[in-house]
Amino acid sequence: MKITVYQKPSCTTCREVYKALEESGVDFTAVDYYVDPLSKHKLEKLLKKMGMKAPELLRKKEEIYKTLGLDKKNLSEEECVDLMVRHPDLIQRPIVEKGQKAILARPAERLKEIL
């Protein structure tokens, strides 16, 4: 079954997951979502496959989170998704998708859950 990793190549955890997949000989596709942005529909599908709500996927320590004053707002599911689509830095990473399941592979050891 095809595996897709949604990542930011400069992210340490993303590089760990990439290396682990390469070393295990697993066939996978890496998607840099800064170059190939996630659509709202795709992000919603990934959230559903992960069993997560959008606020759980927000990177709350990112500068943009504070700059936009998001720490002072009670955001809806749709608002969070829209923000992550517009500002990919707000997306926790890496996300690993395999068939009807996806995980947030943070820490990288979580990768075992999907292989």
Role assignments for model-derived ranges:
Residues 1-24, 28-33:
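Local sequence-structure signature of Cys/Sec-based thiol-disulfide redox active-site neighborhoods
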Residues 35-115:
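Thiol/selenol-based redox catalytic cores and closely related redox-interacting motifs
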